[in-house]
Amino acid sequence: MTAPAGPRGSETERLLTPNPGYGTQAGPSPAPPTPPEEEDLRRRLKYFFMSPCDKFRAKGRKPCKLMLQVVKILVVTVQLILFGLSNQLAVTFREENTIAFRHLFLLGYSDGADDTFAAYTREQLYQAIFHAVDQYLALPDVSLGRYAYVRGGGDPWTNGSGLALCQRYYHRGHVDPANDTFDIDPMVVTDCIQVDPPERPPPPPSDDLTLLESSSSYKNLTLKFHKLVNVTIHFRLKTINLQSLINNEIPDCYTFSVLITFDNKAHSGRIPISLETQAHIQECKHPSVFQHGDNSFRLLFDVVVILTCSLSFLLCARSLLRGFLLQNEFVGFMWRQRGRVISLWERLEFVNGWYILLVTSDVLTISGTIMKIGIEAKNLASYDVCSILLGTSTLLVWVGVIRYLTFFHNYNILIATLRVALPSVMRFCCCVAVIYLGYCFCGWIVLGPYHVKFRSLSMVSECLFSLINGDDMFVTFAAMQAQQGRSSLVWLFSQLYLYSFISLFIYMVLSLFIALITGAYDTIKHPGGAGAEESELQAYIAQCQDSPTSGKFRRGSGSACSLLCCCGRDPSEEHSLLVN
């Protein structure tokens, strides 16, 4: 029988012609839809979107993923706490050694003086350089810590020695401020002096004439101040972190790469002095700890975490896959039987964002745990990467708990409000970001030379965000007030800049932002509001009047069913989704 002519038939052909269909035939099926088939599809759709409690009432199958997520939260949190204690000791050890190096090698250093520590005369600069090298040579006698020298080690700047004292300067430089003339060749030349540490502990400090000639050659250093770019001192030291014994772990061996920089690139008469370190962790050779406890329990616990997260990953991935298959079946059915194309937003309703979040957390946890095992075995030293992986995964695991709270109306306020308000908030933030970036660039260019909080774009953004929250408001104004004598015009501009920003963002932008959230909350409180509107998919599922306790979802429930797959199931239930 031919299709009926007329607008309705043409419209049907137009909808069916462009795409051959989601695994279905290109043309409409001449057979009318069978009510049992459609009712079965509705029932399976309703079961798919049920909560774990309703699924238990419908088929009597226990919410495996819910129980597994509870177990995973416990083991992942305990693992994070154990690793956090170990990581805290490692970070503290590196920070304390860096502070100790600054007090040892920087002449006249005091805590908190990193930004203001500098040399202002030639004598001060020479004294600071020689003091650092002298302290390096006498380190075994003056240091409270146990350090060992590293000779060479493959670094190009040491040239086989323990310490490299280098000055970098322009190839040719002549500056005559009196005549306002200069002649500069910007090519930078590097000259280094290698200093070797003593082969044995040095004599008491009173005997200054017994230093080796190779070690005292640095005293002949002559700096080319008129074209000097910077002076650097490179060396490496070894030490052992014994704090890890507190956590029943084998101590780590550290190699600290120390860089002392005397920066003269500004040629402003002030040479800032800084000391930076990089710590490299490696396994100690022949470690021996008397009565050291067995570490197998920690390894066994990490294996349990990996197995738990792997099982969670498989269950959530299976649910995502079955949701995708059910989506294709629903799309094909509606296209084949009703000639209707399902929109993208309706198809996205089959994609459970909570499962994607849990899958992501499982991947991060497994990766972080494997890295943690390598760190404890002293094969890896990436504490920072491991902490980021484990910390992010734990955050996602705890956020995933909110999914199960959304099944209860009284606990669903937060998620429902965010879901309703998110589109409006995103559009609002896009408009606000344009104004915010404009203020950032303007403040950086105009106020940067006069205000320490506006020296870089990142600092400007942090300062403005603090002003929105009402933090450091007086301090920001006071710091600009101190610069009034330098430029009255800039001070006047700063007042207009700060007052306009604060007025705009606190009294208007922030108030409107809060109003959007409040409006979304009011919407979900009223049943007749926009937040209560149903999609076409939800309306289609609502036509199924079967309750979870009706028994109609239990067909074939007596078949053997394992945790990951079902065997011997009834053919009519081959598409049933066991989503907890």
Swiss-Prot record:
Coiled coil: none annotated. Changing residue 146 to S: Disrupts tetrameric assembly and abolishes lysosomal localization. Residues 457-477 dip into the membrane without crossing it. Residues 565-567 are annotated as: Required for palmitoylation and association with membranes. Residues 1-38 are annotated as: Disordered. Changing residue 465 to L: In ML4; still localizes to late endosomes; fails to rescue defect of lactosylceramide traffic through the late endocytic pathway in ML4 patient cells; minor effect on formation and extrusion of tubulo-vesicular structures when overexpressed. A motif (Dileucine internalization motif) lies at residues 573-578. PANTHER family: MUCOLIPIN, MUCOLIPIN-1. This is Mucolipin-1. The gene is MCOLN1.
